[in-house]
Amino acid sequence: MDIVYQSHHATVPERVRLNASRALERLGLRLTRPVSGVIRFEEDGRMRRVELELVGRGRRLVAEGTGRYFGPALAAALAHLEAQLRRVGRLNVRRARRPVRA
């Protein structure tokens, strides 16, 4: 899976980038055939914003987290993305369990 980093007016520590890429790859395994991922870091005054985008086989999931530091913002974005993946998984299970009408 290709991961692209984008930083808008932000200096991001290497450790945060590494944590973000590992987490996105881990969550990408739960999505059917992940194609690419984008991690955006943004800094505006005291607020930090992290946006995660995961693209895979007809689905595009986007999650955003904000906080005073990049660590908590990343954790919030990962929680949002994980919730979206749970919802997508439930949708796939519901579709698979449809009874066949004769």
Predicted regions, residues:
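N-terminal, polar/charged subdomain of small-to-medium soluble alpha/beta proteins
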Residues: 1-102
